[in-house]
């Protein structure tokens, strides 16, 4: 078993929303995203069989936040424990996703240089892939 001091762990969680409020507005303002969603629609119905019978708009509203191409990250919260046991927390949030992601990237780079490990619920299967893909989409390296 790996023994990592709690003072070397960065706890991380993200919150996402759909990039458009609904499919209709997505078709108007982001036709390329709407086209992508049309290609994904059958995948959504296979992945979430409970959504069979829902309209395309209902599926988009319910599931868009789960796929980086259709999502937007609105909040990233982190926490870590100091040597004296005190817990420090910080949240990055706002309408400007690119600015938020740049701030998070700066923090993650700093933590990597200090030898921190990341910890979070479903971090490997959701948070990290979502962060990475949204950073690529927003041109953040």
Sequence positions of predicted segments:
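Entry/capping segment at the start of metal-dependent catalytic domains
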Residues: 1-71
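Short, conserved beta-strand segments within well-ordered enzyme catalytic domains
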Residues: 10-11, 77-79
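Short glycine-rich loop/turn motifs
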Residues: 72-76
């Amino acid at each position: 078993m790996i023994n990592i001091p709690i003072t070397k762990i960065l706890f991380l969680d993200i919150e996402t929303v759909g990039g458009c409020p609904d499919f209709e507005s997505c078709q108007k303002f982001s036709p390329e995203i709407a086209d992508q969603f049309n290609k994904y629609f059958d995948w959504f119905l296979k992945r979430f069989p409970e959504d069979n019978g829902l309209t395309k708009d209902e599926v988009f509203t319910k599931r868009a936040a789960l796929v980086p191409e259709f999502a937007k990250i609105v909040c990233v919260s982190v926490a870590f424990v100091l040597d004296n046991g005190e817990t420090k927390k910080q949240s990055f949030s706002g309408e400007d996703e690119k600015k938020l992601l740049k701030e998070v990237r700066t923090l993650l780079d700093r933590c990597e240089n200090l030898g921190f490990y990341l910890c979070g619920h479903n971090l490997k299967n959701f948070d990290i892939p979502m962060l990475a893909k949204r950073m690529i989409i927003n041109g953040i390296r």
